[in-house]
Amino acid sequence: MLAFSASLCFKENAALKAFLVSFLTLLAAASLCAAQQTDSTSATPTAATYLKLAGEVDGALHNDVLNLWFPRAIDHEHGGYHSHFGRDWQREPSDGKFSVFQGRMTWVTSQVVLREPDKKAEYLPYIKQGLDFLENTMWDKQDGGFFWGLDDNGEVTPEFGDGKQLYGIDFCIYGAAAAYQATGDKRALELAKRGFYWLDEHAHDTVNAGYFETLTRDGKPVLPHAPAGQIEAGPVGPVGYKSMNAHIHLLEALTELYRVWPDATLRARVEETLAVVRDKICVEPGAMNLYFTNDWRAIPGPDSYGHDVETAYLMLETDELLHTQASEKTERMARMLVDHALAYGWDKANGGFFENGPTFGPPEDTRKEWWVQCEGLNALLMMHQRYGKQDPIYFQRFLEQWTFIKNHTIDSRYHGTINMTTAEGKPLTEDKGSIWKAGYHDGRAFWNVSARLRELAQNP
């Protein structure tokens, strides 16, 4: 009896084991099939997929960028645009008028007219608001050039100083050039040209290429000074040195101006700046140094993943404008920048790009900033459009990036983009607008992504 029971038990266990093995095998097969279907969707998305995503991005562009900033940011009392808004988009006390913010918002309003003609009547006055302020207030009538920043009444302040910064001049030229393209107002073009001429006369480094970044009010370059070995910290980087950040945006600004004014000297400077960014600032295997001596010797520092992916886009945009098709050299470096950022700066658990880290190794700052996520979205889809048939990874990461933006970067309660979150997406900041946070990174990314998705839908 005992032997019979043991035998029966063995047979029942064997049958159960066989059933479990079969069940788990089927479950694994089903999971693999589902995974393959997901991967297949990512690798070969349909026109319907692209159009659905384009609709979502359009919604974010209008509900979380344009409809929040305008007309809310129009400063009827002082001119220009007000920058400081709380999480609920209530106006906060002014932080003054900052060249970067004023130029960027002039560019944004101009892009609305260029890309969405049905809004032209509404936005033309908003462009004029920015252009008038750049011309009548930000431009230094005494010594020329654009001020770095002023108070609301257009006066020099200790916080901003009376000097000039390449980074700020970049965006004033950028905004004025876009305003001309959108409106045909010749004073916008003349202002952009005046800014370029002043910058080229005072800041162009004719020996080493590139531009000096910190200037006195009358346009004299401020060179490095290190009493006791300590370099003065400037608003963009160490005073007297050249930076990645100011030069990638110089490339952006000069490209925008060349789009409407194909001047020979300007073209030479655009070509030079592209070469500086691609061949001196960018390095294999796809990282960028942040700061340089004036003869372009790199100063050690971390790699900024957001600037990597943004620069990939900016280089290709410039090269295509200059030569119709980007060179193999530019294509190669742009792809390396995105691939390196994915390899070292991508959050595989939550999606999205971290803030920064060493060239080789895990990230040091795992926070996630709104502009990094938006520039990442733009760059990933750009890479998918170019190389998606070879490698599905770009579209897979694009979908993950968009999911993170929808779920965490965009504020579901008050709308708009949250400046900074944890890696998991928990908000770390409250303000929706500041002198450094305009509607530029997210607006541009959403416009570009929407247009690119519709192009892809035509030829999936």
Place the predicted regions along the sequence by residue.
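Serine residues within intrinsically disordered or low-complexity segments
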Residues: S5-S7, S22
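Bacterial N-terminal signal peptides
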Residues: F19-S31
